[in-house]
A protein has these predicted regions:
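PLP-dependent class I/II
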Residues: 1-147
């Protein structure tokens, strides 16, 4: 079955000389990627070689950039990397994978950009940021700060 599907893809590519399908899919994936990242409040570094089929967000990188090293140390000391994706699923009904299962950083999360609508990726971006901000609020409360 896989060989047949590969043969059909190859045959289709021979007929689509202008790469219309390929360009359409690449545009769709980029729009989804942009929609997700724009709604995290994080900056997506341009990469002309990015395939974009999956996107990985390293939560620890953004924890440090947004709240500092002290917050990042708090996260590592008080939570397991899987807690983030579990918290995300419980609070927002968004299910993402932990990136370490794909040889990514322990505190990374991974989203497939292949199967949801663009608006769903906006929700994912907002949900990821919401959970990170909730952890930061817990950290501030633990330090005795109110906000």
């Amino acid at each position: 079955p896989q060989q047949m599907q590969m043969a059909l893809f190859a045959a289709y590519a021979l007929f689509d000389k202008e790469d219309r399908y390929k360009k359409k899919i690449q545009k769709m994936i980029k729009e989804r990627l942009d929609a997700m990242w724009e709604n995290t409040g994080f900056e997506l570094v341009p990469d002309p070689l990015r395939a974009g089929y999956y996107s990985e967000i390293d939560i620890m990188v953004w924890a440090k950039k947004l709240y500092g090293d002290e917050f990042a140390c708090y996260l590592e000391a008080n939570y397991d990397p899987l807690d983030f994706v579990i918290h995300l699923a419980k609070d927002t009904c968004i299910v993402l994978l932990n990136g370490s299962g794909f040889d990514g950083p322990d505190w990374s999360i991974r989203a497939s950009l292949a199967n949801l609508d663009k608006d769903d990726y906006k929700k994912i971006g907002k949900g990821v940021r919401l959970i990170l901000d909730e952890y930061a609020l817990a950290w501030k409360k633990a330090k005795g700060e109110s906000k």
